[in-house]
């Protein structure tokens, strides 16, 4: 069983959270835990999603990866939350998987969690400093750092995560079948 810590915070993007979590739920060897150090309930940016299965205390050594949704909340809340940033940095420092989408990679770059030498995808936010190595690709895999550009890439991002994280490309077909009800056609 692989365990993924899911960092949640106010105004995270609904689509980025739900699409990725749905794909994770397809894979029986993945277990997710939603975490925030103090909040018990989170409402996402569009008010569509409310997360209330949040734990406030964790043992980081129990997790194999961390997933951080993006959205406006990344720049408004995550950017200023030293406890969450420290939690995310634990995964980087310990060479564990880190999955981030939209503005979250920009925030992680700002705080030095993503370095100037790493290639990553993110939302092209003109209000944030971005690395020269920022990619315009929808999804980027750079060793154990997997990033995506925006909510529109969330399903592809989630599929790349499960295939890369579990080192099993056949999961691509399983995810596609669960999402679209059919085999992948050329």
Curated annotation (Swiss-Prot):
Pfam families according to UniProt: DJ-1_PfpI (PF01965)
CDD domains in the record: GATase1_DJ-1
GO annotation, cellular component aspect: cytoplasm
Transmembrane stretches, start-end: none
SUPFAM superfamilies given in the database record: Class I glutamine amidotransferase-like (SSF52317)
Domain of life per record: Bacteria
InterPro entries assigned: Class_I_gatase-like (IPR029062), DJ-1/PfpI (IPR002818), Prot/Nucl_acid_deglycase (IPR050325)
Name recorded for this polypeptide: Uncharacterized protein MG029
Organism: Mycoplasma genitalium (strain ATCC 33530 / DSM 19775 / NCTC 10195 / G37) (Mycoplasmoides genitalium)
């Amino acid at each position: 069983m692989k365990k993924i810590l899911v960092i949640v915070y106010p105004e995270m993007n609904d689509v980025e959270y739900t699409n990725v979590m749905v794909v994770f739920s397809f894979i029986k060897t993945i277990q997710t835990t939603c975490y925030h150090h103090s909040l018990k309930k989170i409402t996402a940016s569009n008010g569509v999603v409310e997360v209330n299965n949040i734990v406030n205390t964790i043992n980081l050594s129990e997790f194999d990866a961390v997933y951080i949704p993006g959205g406006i909340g990344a720049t408004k809340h995550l950017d200023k939350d030293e406890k969450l940033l420290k939690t995310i940095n634990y995964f980087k420092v310990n060479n564990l998987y880190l999955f981030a989408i939209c503005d979250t990679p920009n925030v992680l770059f700002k705080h030095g969690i993503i370095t100037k030498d790493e290639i990553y995808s993110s939302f092209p936010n003109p209000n944030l400093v971005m690395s020269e190595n920022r990619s315009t690709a929808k999804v980027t895999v750079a060793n154990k750092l997997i990033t995506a550009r925006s909510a529109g890439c969330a399903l592809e991002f989630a599929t790349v995560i499960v295939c890369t994280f579990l080192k099993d490309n056949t999961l691509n077909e399983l995810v596609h079948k669960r999402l679209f009800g059919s085999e992948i056609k050329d």
